C-alpha cells in the first residue's frame, strides 16, 4: 500500500487578482507598454495541467513530496481564482500500489494499473487538499464526452457549478476505458485534454507544467546555443518547427502536443504558459504574471463556445476537399459553396459534421453540412443556382453556411 504522509506547507502569501475577466489590453502588451503582471492581473479562471514527468520519480512511481507542494500552490491559487486541475499519474500510483519497479509494456496491464492507481491518486489528492481547507471533485473523461454535444453541455454545466462553489475539479482521461490500443475514443494526451477543458469553461489562463523551462528555438539538450523563447505572439510554422519534427527526441518528448494545446487555447482567447514543474511555485508565479516559462498570447477575439466545440471536439463523419478560391473565401468569413468543392470523402448525412481540407489535404475548418455525401457528390463544382436542376430540390444555397463553420 502507498503511504500517505501529510505535510502542511506554510509561508505562502495569498495572491490578489483583479475581477475583470476579459479586460486584457492586447495592444498595449504587444507594443511593450504593458508587462505580464498587468496582462494576467485579471485572470480568475485557470486550468493547470501537470504531467507525469513532474509528478513522478525516475522509476515512474509518484513523488509524494512534490505532489504536496503542488497541492499547496494550487490551494493558494484557489483563494482568489477558480482552478481546474488536469492531472496525470494514475499509472505511477498503480505501480506504487502494486510495488512494481518498471512500467509494463502490455496496454491492458497499463490500463489495469491506471484503474488501481486512480483510486490511490484521488485519495492522496483528497487528503492533501483537505489539509488546506479545499474540496475536490473527480472527473474521468473520454473523447466521447467532448464530441457528443449533449454530454459536452452537461459537463460544462457541472464544471461551472463546481467552480461556483470554490471546489477544485481534478480531471484525468479515463484510461482504463480508452487505452492506447482503442482508436477514436481517446483524447490522446493530457495537454490536449487540458486545452479542451480550458475551451469548455472559457478559462482565462492555461498553465502546463513540464520538465523543461518552456519553448526553445531548437532542442536545448542537443544544441548548446539554443535560445529560450519567452513570448509567442503569433503561433506560426517557425514555432511549430521549434517544437521538433515528428519522431525526433524533442518532438516525442511532448513539446509538439503542447504547441497543439497552445493553438487550441489561444484561438479561444485563453493565454497559455509552458513552465518548468521542477519548482511547483511556478504555478503561482505564472498566474501572478512573473517572468516564468513561455507565454503564448491569446487571440484578440474569443470564438464562441459552439464554434470552439465544432472546431476541436465534434466528431467529423467525413470530409470535403476545396479549391484555393473556396479556401480564401472561408478565411474571409464566407460560406462554402458547392462550386468550390472538389472531392467528397466518406458517408454522411445532412446536419453532420465534416472536416474541410485544402487541395493538399491540410485541415482548414470543420462545419455542419447542409447536404449529404451523396448529394454533395452530385453538386460539387456546380453553381448554387444549378443545385435544384441536379437534385430536383435545394435545401440551401450554401453547402456549408459560415455560421456553422469553425476555422482551425
List where the protein language model places each region.
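Short, Lys/Arg-enriched N-terminal segments with co-localized hydrophobic residues
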Residues: 15-33
